[in-house]
């Protein structure tokens, strides 16, 4: 199963660059504060997504070989172009993996307590200076000069699109069919 569906080098590298792990960034307006739970109360926390076997069995996942949906280098695609709405409209039938170049990025709401764009995920930076970029604890608040490349799955792309205003060029998009876990992988669970 795995040999038949392995990624090519380009889609594998895009997957590695898009992966971000858990979202653990705290509220930037509560930095250096100790938040106490009132006496007699319990702190509340839910992390259902970490119940991995349950998630694997209950929800569709991206499977199969990646399909090149869009590439800016291909002349026939350049004519039609590609935008974020089009990519997001592919979900839930398809999972997407997108490489995009971003310019002039800023939070839609300056009071956003947990900005999503990680400075560490800003690859191939071009003409970005400290005066042209505003960040807080490793999260991008605004970029007024220069550009960068980032890699997003469809969930990350949706969050970036909701939290930020920005100009962009879609460079490449791979899609994967979302489906239930194949029986050969589900049986051991």
Named regions from a protein language model:
Residues 1-189:
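Conserved acidic
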């Amino acid at each position: 199963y795995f040999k038949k569906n392995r990624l090519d080098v380009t889609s594998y590298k895009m997957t590695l660059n898009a992966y971000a792990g858990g979202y653990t960034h705290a509220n930037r307006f509560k930095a250096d504060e100790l938040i106490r739970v009132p006496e007699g109360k319990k702190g509340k926390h839910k992390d259902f997504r970490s119940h991995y076997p349950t998630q694997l069995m209950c929800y569709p996942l991206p499977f199969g070989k990646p399909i090149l949906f869009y590439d800016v280098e291909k002349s026939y695609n350049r004519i039609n172009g590609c935008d974020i709405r089009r990519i997001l409209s592919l979900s839930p039938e398809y999972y997407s993996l997108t490489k995009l170049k971003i310019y002039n990025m800023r939070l839609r709401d300056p009071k956003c307590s947990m900005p999503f764009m990680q400075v560490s995920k800003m690859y191939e930076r071009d003409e970005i200076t400290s005066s042209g970029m505003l960040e807080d604890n490793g999260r991008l608040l605004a970029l007024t000069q220069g550009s960068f490349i980032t890699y997003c799955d469809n969930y990350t792309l949706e969050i970036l699109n909701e939290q930020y205003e920005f100009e962009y060029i879609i460079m490449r998009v791979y899609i994967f069919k979302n489906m239930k876990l194949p029986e050969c992988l589900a049986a051991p669970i």
